[in-house]
Amino acid sequence: MYAVIVSGGKQHRVKEGERLKLEKIEVETGGVVEFDKVLLVANGDDVKVGAPVVEGAKVTAEVVAHGRHKKVNIIKFRRRKHHMKRMGHRQWFTEVKITGITG
């Protein structure tokens, strides 16, 4: 059984017991998160596609950890002017473990 959920403006295909990194969610470690924006639920040959979401479908997950991704380096420069600006960015994430899919 798998489902497609929306979290942080992105769509994720999830299965029960799977761990994945999502955009930062304001829930403490060990807490439970419920995703009600479920776009698709599939159980073998029984596939339910929402328009836009599947009514009554829900995915529950447990928050495992919070952290930051690897650093992304950004370089801006102006040609022929000897001007360069170096910047970096590290995006926050929340790692969750999918505990249940209903619907």
Curated annotation (Swiss-Prot):
**Do the record's keywords include rRNA-binding?**
yes
Q: What are the entry keywords?
A: Ribonucleoprotein, Ribosomal protein, RNA-binding, rRNA-binding
Q: Name one GO cellular component term.
A: ribonucleoprotein complex
**Coiled-coil segments, which residues?**
none
- Name the InterPro entries for this protein: bL21-like, bL21-like_sf, Ribosomal_bL21, Ribosomal_bL21_CS
Which SUPFAM superfamilies does the annotation name? L21p-like
For this chain's UniProt record, which GO biological process terms are given?
translation
Please name the GO terms that the record assigns under molecular function: rRNA binding; structural constituent of ribosome
PANTHER family, per the entry? 50S RIBOSOMAL PROTEIN L21, LARGE RIBOSOMAL SUBUNIT PROTEIN BL21M
Summary of the function given for this chain in its UniProt record: This protein binds to 23S rRNA in the presence of protein L20.
Q: How does it assemble?
A: Part of the 50S ribosomal subunit. Contacts protein L20.
Family to which the UniProt record says this protein belongs: Belongs to the bacterial ribosomal protein bL21 family.
State the HAMAP family in the record.
Ribosomal_bL21
This chain's protein is named Large ribosomal subunit protein bL21
Identify the species of origin: Hahella chejuensis (strain KCTC 2396)
This protein's encoding gene: rplU
